[in-house]
């Protein structure tokens, strides 16, 4: 009996450690023109057979749907553009390793790899709905980049406005290597 229980516990621990290897957690902070702001929560990313699953645990956000992307650089620092300090500009653009130059959303393989489904924020300012990114298969594809939340929605097109017509960068998290 002792050995059976010990075997079950050991098996459970091995399973948990294997699951931990297939997830990563990204701390998200307000993106400010003066630098990184307050922590607003975290996003857990898990590998699934269907793509990467992004599970937000965020608060203090504006209700509605917001553009959500993987950006090229592992930075959330501001940068200068047209003489103005822009929040999280050092994160670069949407992850686009194939250099498509097209914003076509998470389901079209001819656009940015970093285009993710829209982030849904509840009326109370929390975001908890998981998002599936079917084109991203491995956590290694994310490492050394950043996650970005934009003000406003995303139409998954470059028309009528570039990059889905989303607004300013307002939350960012660096994905460590």
Curated annotation (Swiss-Prot):
Disulfide bonds: 76-172
Major localization listed first in the record, in broad terms: periplasm
EC number: 1.15.1.1
Top enzyme class: oxidoreductase
Source organism of this protein record: Salmonella typhimurium (strain LT2 / SGSC1412 / ATCC 700720)
Protein name: Superoxide dismutase [Cu-Zn] 1
Gene (UniProt): sodC1
GO molecular function, one term: identical protein binding
Pfam families linked: Sod_Cu
């Amino acid at each position: 009996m002792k050995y059976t229980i010990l075997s079950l516990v050991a098996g459970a621990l091995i399973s948990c450690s294997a699951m931990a290897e297939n997830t990563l957690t990204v701390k998200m902070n307000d993106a400010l023109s003066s630098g990184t702001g307050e922590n607003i929560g975290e996003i857990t990313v898990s590998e699934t057979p269907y793509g990467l699953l992004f599970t937000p645990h965020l608060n203090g956000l504006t209700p509605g749907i917001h553009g959500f992307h993987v950006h090229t650089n592992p930075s959330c620092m501001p940068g200068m553009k047209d003489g103005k300090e822009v929040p999280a500009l050092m994160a670069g653009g949407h992850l686009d390793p194939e250099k498509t130059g097209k914003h076509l959303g998470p389901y079209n393989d001819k656009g940015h790899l970093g285009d993710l489904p829209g982030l849904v924020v509840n009326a109370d300012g929390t975001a908890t709905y998981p998002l599936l990114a079917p084109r991203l298969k491995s956590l290694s594809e994310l490492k050394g980049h950043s996650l970005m939340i934009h003000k406003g929605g995303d139409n998954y097109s470059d028309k009528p406005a570039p990059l889905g017509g989303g607004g300013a960068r307002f939350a960012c998290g660096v994905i460590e290597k």
